[in-house]
Amino acid sequence: MASLSRPSLPSCLCSFLLLLLQVSSSYAGQFRVIGPRHPIRALVGDEVELPCRISPGKNATGMEVGWYRPPFSRVVHLYRNGKDQDGEQAPEYRGRTELLKDAIGEGKVTLRIRNVRFSDEGGFTCFFRDHSYQEEAAMELKVEDPFYWVSPGVLVLLAVLPVLLLQIAVGLVFLCLQYRLRGKLRAEIENLHRTFDPHFLRVPCWKITLFVIVPVLGPLVALIICYNWLHRRLAGQFLEELRNPF
C-alpha cells in the first residue's frame, strides 16, 4: 500500500502567509464616503457648497473624484489624474462648478456650484474611485425662492408702515405750522385793522386727507407691481429651465 505524502510545515506556512497577504492587500484600499446627512439649502442665484469626504481619511490626490446626478448619471463635476475634466460635464453645469481641493490630502473635497437654478434642486451623488474600488454617498439640495420666508401681506406691511408713519408725521407738522401761521396772520390783521373772509385762512379737510393718503398709495402700488414682476421673472426662469435643461 503506497504511503500518502504529507505537505511539509514550511510549505503550509508559506501558503498561509501568501493568503493573508492577498486578503490584507484587498482590504487595504477600502474606505467609506461620507456626505451631508441633512438637505443643503440654497437661494436662487446664490452659490452653494456640497462637501464630501472619505473615512478613514487618506490622500485622495491620485483618486478619481466626482459628482453626478441620478437617475441618468449626468456628470456635474469630475476630477481625474490630478485635473478637472471639464469636457465631461453636463452642459448645464459647465462654467458653474469648482472643486475645492485644499484638504484633498486628507480625503476631503467640496463642490461649489455658482448661480444656483431651480433645476439644480434634487439629489447629487459624490464618489471616490481608487483603481477598481469605488464608494459613493448621496446628498440632497433644496433650492428656495429668496422671498420664501415672507408672505405678500407681510412684505407690503413692512414696506408701507414706515411710509405711513412718515406721512402722519408730515401731516402733523403741516397742521402745526398752519395753526401758527393763522395766529400770526390774525395778529397782523388786527394790528392793521384789516378785514378778511374767515374762510380765507382755512384749509379744507379733504385737501389734508389727500395730502396724507396719496403719497402712501403711490409706493404701495409700486411695491405690489415690483413684487409681482419679481415672482413672474422667477417663475419664467424656472419654466425656461424645464423647457431647455441643456
Curated annotation (Swiss-Prot):
Q: Which residues are glycosylated?
A: 59
Which PROSITE patterns is this protein grouped with?
IG_LIKE
- Domain (Ig-like V-type) spans 30-144
CDD domains assigned: IgV_MOG_like (cd05713)
Query: Where does the protein end up?
Result: Membrane
Q: Which GO terms describe its cellular component?
A: external side of plasma membrane
Bilayer topology annotation? Multi-pass membrane protein
- UniProt family annotation: Belongs to the immunoglobulin superfamily. BTN/MOG family.
Could you tell me what this protein is called?
Answer: Myelin-oligodendrocyte glycoprotein
Origin organism is Pongo abelii
Q: Which gene encodes it?
A: MOG
